[in-house]
Amino acid sequence: MNLIFTCGGTAGHINPAIAVANMMKERFPDCRILFIGASGHMEEKLVPQAGYELKCLPGSGLSRGKNLAALKQNIHAVRCVLNAVKACKRIFREFQPDAVIGTGGYASFPALQAAQSMGIPTCVHESNALPGLTTKLAANKADKVLVAFEESVPYYKHPERVEVVGMPVRREFIFTDKEQARKKLGLDSRPLVVSAFGSNGAKVMNETVAGLFRLEKEAGFPFRHIHATGRFGWEWMPDLVRSQGVDPDAEESIDLREYIYDMANVMSAADVIISRAGASTCNEIGACGIPCILIPSPNVTNNHQEKNARMLADHEAAVLILEKDCTPQKLYDEITALLSDGPRQEQMRRRLREMVRLDAAERICDIVEALCKR
């Protein structure tokens, strides 16, 4: 069996594909797997680290603007897509895939388009309740459209091809032991807080966390804190933290990283997670059952992150803070209130696990296997 996974841009598109690829490899050890993504993005780090071959093609996303710069950007994007489709066809003729699986991001469109034009079975997975542009375009000719939420089904032209499967997460998010995870990180007895705001980072939230570090220092560092700056915050955030009176190189209570590559282990060790509210992140948090504070990005299409966060908050499975309301003091107060309330933490763990489908990767594998047998 030969499978191609296509995804890219952010970890939210890449990690679900890796979760399914891992499950397929468990079932079929001889299965050949190839990933196709876009040059210059997170897939160049995450996919090889997961042990899979990756081919990256030049790509560019579409602009939703209406000015001349946006027009030029979109002309460039279309040219990139056309060239990438040709490149994918060459790859397919050599690799001979039995199916192509897309998990979102503009990087996945050329491979899906090429596969559909060559009669290769395709399957797309959409993690958000409202489908993204790539999913909308690819879904019309896809053999199977897999969604995380029942509410998503009416948005597709061919509902008979749509199946609700949930959101795939890697098995290590489900089965990693908390005490073993803490031991691996060398933690002391203090609680662990983990904060991350997407693989690219978020300037506003990095600034807020820098202020939060100052409050933690003033309180005598009552908890350990691991923070991921993201790709665009790594160069400048350490200096900002120093300006708050905290030396990130010398202070052992804080651990500043560009990206948390061992997220399953770090998340499993955590007592509180602070993050955005992308569907992939919410499901990973749910699989671990870790009390969380969600600060949805206000800069995403259809405001889908706030909808994700409100759904969890309405079920008392998360604390929701809008970015515009999130100050260092408010965030510190929410963290300490949560850490001091054991019954509330336990309730959040229970509610989170109730809302997550832990068999999503297995269900997707069943569907992919059936496609390959056609």
Question: Positions of the model-derived regions?
Answer:
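A short, well-ordered alpha-helix in the C-terminal region of glycosyltransferases
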Residues: 344-358
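Donor-nucleotide binding loops and adjacent catalytic segments primarily
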Residues: 46, 64-65, 178-183, 187-272, ...
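Active-site-proximal region of nucleotide-activated glycan assembly enzymes
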Residues: 32-34, 53, 116-178
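Conserved nucleotide-sugar phosphate-binding/catalytic loop shared by glycosyltransferases and other
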Residues: 3-10, 26, 30-83, 165, ...
